[in-house]
Curated annotation (Swiss-Prot):
InterPro entries xref list: Methylgl_synth, Methylglyoxal_synth_AS, MGS-like_dom, MGS-like_dom_sf
Gene that encodes the chain: mgsA
Gene Ontology molecular function terms on file: methylglyoxal synthase activity
Keywords on record: Lyase
Domain MGS-like: 6-152
Function: Catalyzes the formation of methylglyoxal from dihydroxyacetone phosphate.
Residues reported to bind substrate: 19, 23, 45-48, 65-66, 98
Record-given protein name: Methylglyoxal synthase
Catalysed transformations (reactions): dihydroxyacetone phosphate = methylglyoxal + phosphate
PANTHER family hit by this protein: METHYLGLYOXAL SYNTHASE
Superkingdom of the organism of origin: Bacteria
Amino acid sequence: MHTTTRTLTQHKRIALVAHDSCKKNLLNWTQKHKEALKPHILYATGTTGHILERETGLSIQSLLSGPMGGDQQLGGLIAEKKIDMMIFFWDPMNAAPHDPDVKALMRIATVWNIPVAINQSSADFLLTSVLFEQDVEIDVPDYEGYLKERLA
């Protein structure tokens, strides 16, 4: 597939997601980085978003809870280029009933080439990168070209 570029602006649209057993870790991480996150637009799946907003005072756009369709909503926002990066604290030791949704979410994040952190260490690296606070060009699928080829 051919690619084109997309600009992630200095004010990022960040998805915050956590499996149930990791919500406390994500909350602690978010509290630690509250000032760095404040200028950005934050999205989260339902339960996580409500917890983060209540406990940190940050403005969070809460979607549905992950198992109720929130992972799919988030995937749609990524495909529409409305999410720039994702912090997803997931639990590799416990299966979740919505694992297929999680796999689909990770696949879409990979297809659209957004930065993804899957634990505290990788989230720290993303947030402290010099690229975090500046405009960044990333390669993304050339959907228009893809569509033209398919319809030719």
